[in-house]
Each structure stands twice: as structure tokens, then as C-alpha cells.
């Protein structure tokens, strides 16, 4: 499990990205790069890192399911992920 402070920081970044999205798009369209540089660094969508929605783990993230491989494996073995079956060939 990720530290609570790291999860909170990631949520704060996501909120900043959402808050400045329209302003950032307008500045980009106008080509105002000085104005873009004046915005907070954390308002850039590039700085948002995908995290597991269960425990906040940042590594081994599976986009399709929104969780890390560890939690995916655990839930898949329990049969709690719809459409996922153990492979057999």
C-alpha cells in the first residue's frame, strides 16, 4: 500500500489538472507559452501518474482494470473481475 501522503498528493495534482484544463487549452491554442509557464507545475496532465484505485500502488498499473497486477491477480483468482477467467490451453 502506498503512503497516504503520496495518495493525497496525487489527488491534489488531479484536482489541479482539472481546475486549469480549460485555461491551459486556451493558452496552448493561442500559443502563449509564457502564460503556460506561469501556471502551476502540477497543473500539467503529464505530471499525473496512474495509481491503483484500491491501495494507491503506482507501479505495474493495468489501465484496462485501473489496478496494479497484484490486486488484479488477487481479485481475478476470487472471480471478482467480470469477464476474466484463468487461462487454459
Curated annotation (Swiss-Prot):
InterPro entries tied to this protein: Ribosomal_uS14, Ribosomal_uS14_bac/plastid, Ribosomal_uS14_sf
Keywords, sorted A to Z: Ribonucleoprotein, Ribosomal protein, RNA-binding, rRNA-binding
Keyword Magnesium set for record: no
One function term, GO molecular function aspect: rRNA binding
GO biological process assignments: translation
This protein's record includes keyword Ribosomal protein: yes
One Gene Ontology cellular component annotation held by this UniProt entry: small ribosomal subunit
Protein family according to the UniProt entry: Belongs to the universal ribosomal protein uS14 family.
Function in brief: Binds 16S rRNA, required for the assembly of 30S particles and may also be responsible for determining the conformation of the 16S rRNA at the A site.
The protein's assembly and partners: Part of the 30S ribosomal subunit. Contacts proteins S3 and S10.
Name the UniProt record assigns to this protein: Small ribosomal subunit protein uS14
Organism: Leuconostoc mesenteroides subsp. mesenteroides (strain ATCC 8293 / DSM 20343 / BCRC 11652 / CCM 1803 / JCM 6124 / NCDO 523 / NBRC 100496 / NCIMB 8023 / NCTC 12954 / NRRL B-1118 / 37Y)
